Amino acid sequence: MPQRLICILCLCGFVFAAMPGVWLDVPFIKQEKDGCGAASIAMVMQYWRKQQAKAVDAAADAVEIQRALYSRKDHGIRASDLEHYFQQHGFQTFAFEGKWDDLKQHLEKGRPLIAALKPSSLESSLHFVVVVGIDPAEGVVYLNDAAQRKLLKQDRSSFERQWSAGKHWTLLALPK
């Protein structure tokens, strides 16, 4: 019996070690109407609070973030407001034009990213998602999409098309 258990554990370890992708366990928050930006901020803030073993405070509450930043004119939250909110709450931010390799690099370091997508169903608005995983061998990315679900699997070409329409806008927020 003990030998069998050891074999099973070794086999499981081999299977997990053979997985070429990376995935971060970022909390998922469902968005309110036009609330993808607020939910994305909340997911990333709660992830870092958990990593630092800190209690989640009101600053990481999607409803409060939406109330503070929502623009009726823009039907959501502007990308620059995402950055400012993080900065006001003790985070360093880096907004950049992302590339596929940037996703892998940051995720391997345990850093989730917020990406601006422009799905064809949205005429002029951007849709913010949290990039939580990538599997280059399969050519897929995993998203916490506040409008849909946690760990939404999207093929690279579809993601790149929507990300390109959003000018590859990417936000890295790190606790100070």
Model-based region annotation:
Residues 12-14, 94, 157:
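Short non-domain terminal segments
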Residues 17, 72-75, 108, 112, ...:
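Noncatalytic regulatory segments and standalone regulatory/sensor domains
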